[in-house]
Every structure is written in structure tokens, then in C-alpha cells.
């Protein structure tokens, strides 16, 4: 799997420029004009992981296959979008399909780039985006809750349970709070996720700053960081211009460019890390002569379900997992050395896969 991240924001905040850079494509027509992105553009990137390169070298793998991250560039929101202003509800549904939402906020001053509300205020921009998503959630949830409540009153047990779940985000949305604030029990979570509420998604605030502020941020991004800390959201500081230049460079020129900009790594890496932390994702590996491959799972996933990410047959016929920790695999110079050192473990169906595990699944056909 990997994960799917929706990129949202007001028009002209650098959203499509950032999308182009992150996915190294020119799929989104980045122009100084609101609503130039009408259909969501979808781009995939390989998730950088130095461990995978090391494993491929040690395991003498012919091919390296990273896990994938999907970005969905969703058309520019404006105030009133939930009521059909701007592009309206046509694109809001695209956010329902993503795992996390990146709010791109304009944290730079440039008189040549218009702002849809003629001001530079990233917190106000975030409020506009969040409000429109909350209003869309409230409208859809009230319609569904009304129908479910009627069924619940007839004594339908399933309807009663579902209505109890619906009530929690409904009350919050009526108070102007996002659905992600709802306190759900583990038993309620599947039903809550199935509601696919826009504001139930974890949020990453992406502060698009001027080039000179890419390393340390600026006064605007500091405001966003304070809000994110209070909300438990993530923040990534990025200069879309720098990312755009970086994406067009030859591989051998990239390190020098980053050093010149005072950066240790590209913004993509920081955004991926923020997303993984928000969604509580971990990576395990499979290594062989043919390929070294990374697989993304949710923290806490057990071995059979982790195997199922490769193929459903692996999960159905799961017998055991031959498991070596990443450090032990490298220290042993591969599977044979790790096994000789007593570092290979045979794990059963209750084993919780750890980040960095190198695994070989045994299964019955």
C-alpha cells in the first residue's frame, strides 16, 4: 500500500506547483488563475528509504522497488465551495478517498501573485478550507443521520449502533469543530471511517514559504506551527519554487543544490515522514536476488495481514514468517549470515510486524 494524500488549498497558494514538483510531472497546469485544476490530478512517487538501497546491495537484488505514495491535487477551494461557489461540490468528494489531507497555505508575499481574498493570512486561509469541509460534512451527515434515526426508532439494532456513532461527529460539526475531534471506541472506528467524512482525515499543514525561508520558516509559518501544535496536526515547511527547481535537476546536481539552499533533504521526504507519523505507518521489506521491495502497513499489523498486502493468497494460506530485523540482516551481510548468527526468527500468526523487518512468508496453496 503506501498512502494517498490529498492536496487542498485556496487558489494561487502554490498548490499545483508543489504537486508538479513532488510528482516530478507537469500534469497540473500551474497558472496564476483560480480554478485551473478542475479534475484532481493524481501522481505517484516512490517513497525514499535508504534502508531499501542498503538491503538491495547486501542481498544483491537486481531491482529496487520502493513503496508508493499517491498525491491527489484537488481543485482550489474558495469560501462558499460547500454551497457551490467556485468549483463547488464537484471536487469535494475526491477528498473522501484519501488517507490524509495536506492543507497548502500561502506563507509568502508576492505582489505578482494574486490572492483570492486579497490578503496574506495563512491561518484565515486554513479556516476557510476547514469551514468549507465541515459544512460539506454537516450537510451530508445530517441527511444520512435523519434516515438512520428513523430506522433506529423501529428497534433496528444495527441502525441504533450506527446512529450512536453518527451523533458524535454530528454534534461536533454543529459546534464548528472537525469530525476528527470525535472520541471513538475501537469498536466504533470501522463505522466512523465508513462515514468518509472530509474532516475526519488527519491534517498536514504545508507552509509554502519564499525561497530564503525554506530552511527556517518565517513569521507566517510560525503562526501555523503554533496552531498545529494545539491541534495535534503536522507541519511541513516547503518552498514550492525550490521544490520545482529541484525536481528538474539531474540526480548528480541535487545534493549541491540542496546545500546551496541550506537544506538537508527535499520537501518530499519531510512530507512523507509527516504523513507516515500521522497515519502511524511502518515499512517492512522483502529481499531476494530478483528484487528488494518495501511494503507499507499500519503499525500494529499482524504477520498474516502484512503478508496479505503482497497477495491475498499469502494471508489466506499463512503458515509462518521467517523474520530478520533490518540491523541484523545488514550486520550478517544477508540472510545466511543473519541465520548463522541466530538472528532469524520464525514468527506465527499473532506476531506484530515491526518497522524494518525483513520477511519471507511461508504459506499453503
Q: What residues fall within each predicted segment?
A:
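Amphipathic alpha-helical transducer elements in NTP-driven molecular machines
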Residues: 35, 49-52, 65-71, 85-98, ...
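Short, glycine/charged-enriched secondary-structure capping and boundary segments
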Residues: 22, 84-87, 116-119, 218-222, ...
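Phosphate-binding glycine-rich loops and adjacent basic patches that engage nucleotide phosphates
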Residues: 3, 14-20, 48-60, 88-112, ...
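Short capping/connector residues at structural and topological boundaries
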Residues: 6, 35, 40-43, 50-52, ...
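Conserved G1/Walker A P-loop phosphate-binding module
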Residues: 1-114, 142-143, 148
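C-terminal-of-GTPase-core extension/linker across diverse P-loop GTPases
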Residues: 2-8, 13, 19, 142, ...
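Glycine-rich, flexible loop/turn motifs
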Residues: 26-34, 41-43, 51-54, 83, ...
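Conserved Switch II/interswitch segment of TRAFAC-class P-loop GTPases
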Residues: 43-48, 75-85, 96-157, 172-185, ...
